[in-house]
């Protein structure tokens, strides 16, 4: 399979095909500050977007990759970027390397570079909060996204897994039949932020469905942030997961820095040795020219981090509840499709 690094990003849509920034008239007066019509019937704003991201087809290198950009293109996530390789933002799915760079840069901006807020919105929509990490998405509006197509619960969960798994590593997915909603937990928050924008107002129909041509008549998925699980055991597991994620990130960054720094030092030392001792054996000289170990880049330090990570993993496994005992937000979430 070809990596996105081996190709240029695709132009997802022509500029002439982009919708107007002014919404359809639903009132008497247009407010230029809020980009909304007032003094009229608001109507149903739910719809199925005519644009959709296809990660394998659309991903590729952009001008942002060459400029060292950290943030991703919001319009790429929505499937409607008209710049392609000329875009100043990234056009691929966030991976571990991107997540490590974002974590070092800031915690108050999302993966698109937008400022987060102190608290979540009342309806759990929007950009999110910088106070708490949230990797779980609530997925509603499933009936409208299927154009009322009747499917078994296992089939619905399978479709949710298919469309969301393309947008990052999934921790777990659960479909709650009684409330006709689903929950998708990603391994990293940046992937959850990306998927929330990419899957909002998208259909769950597939090209093989006979209803595919009429998909625009549906209302699309409603994707929001999931509420925090009030269960103390679940909160403890969450803290352990965050601690383990931080340790994983530290090991990943230290390994990368050690490898890159070691390569650079060796190259410089070899150049110096070639100029100074072109013919003599220089094994002893190489040892004297190597930098002193500061303790942070040694194998012992990395091994200690890995041991701590293993201990946390064992505690996490031993504290997990049995399969038959389910609870938390997967069953107690009060939102519905009509939110």
Swiss-Prot record:
Xref: PANTHER family: PRE-MRNA-SPLICING FACTOR CWC2, PRE-MRNA-SPLICING FACTOR RBM22
Record's miscellaneous remark: Present with 2650 molecules/cell in log phase SD medium.
Function, in words: Involved in the first step of pre-mRNA splicing. Required for cell growth and cell cycle control. Plays a role in the levels of the U1, U4, U5 and U6 snRNAs and the maintenance of the U4/U6 snRNA complex. May provide the link between the 'nineteen complex' NTC spliceosome protein complex and the spliceosome through the U6 snRNA. Associates predominantly with U6 snRNAs in assembled active spliceosomes. Binds directly to the internal stem-loop (ISL) domain of the U6 snRNA and to the pre-mRNA intron near the 5' splice site during the activation and catalytic phases of the spliceosome cycle.
Region (Disordered): 313-339
Limits of the RRM domain: 135-228
Domain notes: The C-terminal RRM domain and the zinc finger motif are necessary for RNA-binding.
The entry's keywords: Cell cycle, Metal-binding, mRNA processing, mRNA splicing, Nucleus, Phosphoprotein, RNA-binding, Spliceosome, Zinc, Zinc-finger
UniProt cross-references to Pfam families, sorted A to Z: RRM_1 (PF00076), Torus (PF16131)
Effect of residue 87 to H: Inhibits cell growth
Protein family per UniProt: Belongs to the RRM CWC2 family.
Organism name: Saccharomyces cerevisiae (strain ATCC 204508 / S288c)
Primary location recorded for the protein, binned into one broad class: nucleus
Post-translational modification Phosphoserine, affected residues: 335-336
PROSITE patterns (alphabetical): RRM, ZF_C3H1
GO MF annotation: an example: U6 snRNA binding
Protein name, entry field: Pre-mRNA-splicing factor CWC2
Matches recorded under InterPro entries: Cwc2/Slt11 (IPR039171), Cwc2_RRM (IPR034181), Nucleotide-bd_a/b_plait_sf (IPR012677), RBD_domain_sf (IPR035979), RRM_dom (IPR000504), Torus (IPR032297), Znf_CCCH (IPR000571)
Chain positions of all zinc fingers (C3H1-type): 67-94
GO cellular component: Prp19 complex; U2-type catalytic step 1 spliceosome; U2-type catalytic step 2 spliceosome
CDD domains: RRM_cwf2
GO biological process: mRNA cis splicing, via spliceosome; mRNA splicing, via spliceosome; positive regulation of cell cycle; positive regulation of RNA splicing; spliceosomal snRNP assembly
Subunit structure of this chain's protein: Belongs to the CWC complex (or CEF1-associated complex), a spliceosome subcomplex composed of the U2, U5 and U6 snRNAs and at least BUD13, BUD31, BRR2, CDC40, CEF1, CLF1, CUS1, CWC2, CWC15, CWC21, CWC22, CWC23, CWC24, CWC25, CWC27, ECM2, HSH155, IST3, ISY1, LEA1, MSL1, NTC20, PRP8, PRP9, PRP11, PRP19, PRP21, PRP22, PRP45, PRP46, SLU7, SMB1, SMD1, SMD2, SMD3, SMX2, SMX3, SNT309, SNU114, SPP2, SYF1, SYF2, RSE1 and YJU2. Interacts with ISY1. Interacts with PRP19.
Subcellular location: Nucleus
